[in-house]
């Protein structure tokens, strides 16, 4: 008999059991934790562990149009995220985030604005209106998301002027749990009042909202929150949009950030806070993230 080998197998079994117990303990102690322990592969995949369905909002209230994506089998209630596109753009530009985030345990609404020419402040107002309507649908028995949303846990995302709108939403609504603007633009770069954990996706070769006059000074202006700046190497203004070639990297970061701060799920801390150390990233900065 090979006792050393048997001993090693027993040690491995014990270690595996302890890890399973630890994962279960994390889920039990955090009422917001949803899904299995994350891995790099699971976060880089095009879909998470939950099945996703969607529906079009029949009567948008305070914004142009909306599509809601939601997990069917997450168990319990989940947080909600509103995502708004940029100047002249429609929700198709950011729709990839809908099923991606929903498959990891969020209710997500992607919206069209009343006018494609709306400015960041208007985009913020419409984004918050969309979140209010999600909360209303959560209380409507005929709604597909009836009883599925924890209305105390909400987040915002957006691209370009929608990113600027998301930053305004974060500044004006400190109860939001997380924000993730991509290639953000606003007439002001001072968001020093923001306390909401904020992840900024920037695009190195952005000629519409140049990094050094937009995303970076916005990041530098903030000091009261967990924050992160991730710049895509060689990326144009649409480097984080639907159809981009960086979805594995950006999706991993975006999902991990929302899970860490909207769900208070520390299983995602490493993925949310660490430097990806990828050739696709030309600049990375972070502070107060754990």
Curated annotation (Swiss-Prot):
Query: What effect is documented for mutating residue 185 to A?
Result: Exhibits highly impaired PET degradation capacity relative to wild-type PETase. Also displays decreased enzymatic activity on BHET
**Enzyme Commission identifier(s):** 3.1.1.101
Q: How does activity depend on temperature?
A: Optimum temperature is 40 degrees Celsius for PET film hydrolysis. Optimum temperature is 30 degrees Celsius for PET (commercial drinking bottle) hydrolysis and BHET hydrolysis. Optimum temperature is 35-45 degrees Celsius for the hydrolysis of pNP-esters. Remains active even at 65 degrees Celsius (about 60% of maximum activity).
Main location (coarse class): secreted
* Keywords attached to this entry: Disulfide bond, Hydrolase, Secreted, Serine esterase, Signal
UniProt keyword Protein transport present: no
Report activity regulation: Salts and glycerol enhance the enzymatic activity in vitro towards pNP-esters, while detergents and organic solvents reduce the enzymatic activity.
Q: What is the effect of changing residue 241 to F?
A: Increases activity towards 1-naphthyl butyrate
Q: How does activity depend on pH?
A: Optimum pH is 9 for PET film hydrolysis. Optimum pH is 9 for PET (commercial drinking bottle) hydrolysis. Optimum pH is 6.5-8.0 for BHET hydrolysis. Optimum pH is 8.0 for the hydrolysis of pNP-esters. The enzyme is active at pH 6-10, has an optimal pH range of 7-9 and it is rapidly inactivated below pH 7.0 or above pH 9.0.
The pathway it acts in is: Xenobiotic degradation
The free-text biotechnology note states: Has potential for application in environmental remediation and biological recycling of PET and PEF waste products.
Q: Signal sequence span per UniProt?
A: 1-27
Compartments it resides in: Secreted
Family annotation (Pfam families): PETase
Q: Which GO terms describe its cellular component?
A: extracellular region
Please tell me where poly(ethylene terephthalate) binds in this chain: 87, 161, 185
Give the induction annotation: Highly up-regulated during growth on PET film.
Q: Which SUPFAM superfamilies match?
A: alpha/beta-Hydrolases (SSF53474)
Work out whether the entry's keyword set contains Lyase. Answer: no
What happens on changing residue 214 to H?
Answer: Displays increased enzymatic activity on PET bottle
State its role.
Involved in the degradation and assimilation of the plastic poly(ethylene terephthalate) (PET), which allows I.sakaiensis to use PET as its major energy and carbon source for growth. Likely acts synergistically with MHETase to depolymerize PET. Catalyzes the hydrolysis of PET to produce mono(2-hydroxyethyl) terephthalate (MHET) as the major product. Also depolymerizes another semiaromatic polyester, poly(ethylene-2,5-furandicarboxylate) (PEF), which is an emerging, bioderived PET replacement with improved gas barrier properties.
Question: Domain comment?
Answer: PETase retains the ancestral alpha/beta-hydrolase fold but exhibits a more open active-site cleft than homologous cutinases.
**What is this protein's name?**
Poly(ethylene terephthalate) hydrolase
């Amino acid at each position: 008999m090979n006792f050393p080998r048997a001993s090693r197998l027993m040690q491995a079994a014990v270690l595996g059991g302890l890890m399973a117990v630890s994962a279960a303990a994390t889920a039990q102690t955090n009422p917001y934790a949803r899904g299995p322990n994350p891995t790099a592969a699971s976060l880089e995949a095009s879909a998470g562990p939950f099945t996703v369905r969607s529906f079009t909002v029949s009567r948008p209230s305070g914004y142009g149009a909306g599509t809601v994506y939601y997990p069917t089998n997450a168990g319990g209630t989940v947080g909600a995220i509103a995502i708004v596109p940029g100047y002249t753009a429609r929700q198709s530009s950011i729709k990839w985030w809908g099923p991606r985030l929903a498959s990891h345990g969020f209710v997500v609404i992607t919206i069209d604005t009343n006018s494609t020419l709306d400015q960041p402040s208007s985009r913020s107002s419409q984004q918050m209106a969309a979140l209010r309507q999600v909360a209303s649908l959560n209380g409507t028995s005929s709604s597909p998301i009836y009883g599925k949303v924890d209305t105390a846990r909400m987040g915002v995302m957006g691209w370009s002027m929608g990113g600027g709108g998301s930053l305004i939403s974060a500044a004006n609504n400190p109860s939001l749990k997380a924000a993730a603007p991509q290639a953000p633009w606003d007439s002001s770069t001072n968001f020093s009042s923001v306390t909401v954990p904020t992840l900024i996706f920037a695009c190195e070769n952005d000629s519409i909202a140049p990094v050094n006059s937009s995303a970076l000074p916005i990041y530098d202006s903030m000091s009261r929150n967990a924050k992160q700046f991730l710049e895509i190497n060689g990326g144009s203004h649409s480097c984080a949009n639907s159809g981009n070639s960086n979805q594995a990297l950006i999706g991993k970061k975006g999902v991990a950030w929302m899970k860490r701060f909207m769900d208070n799920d520390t299983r995602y801390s490493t993925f949310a806070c660490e430097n990806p150390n990828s050739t696709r990233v030309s600049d990375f900065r972070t502070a107060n993230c754990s």
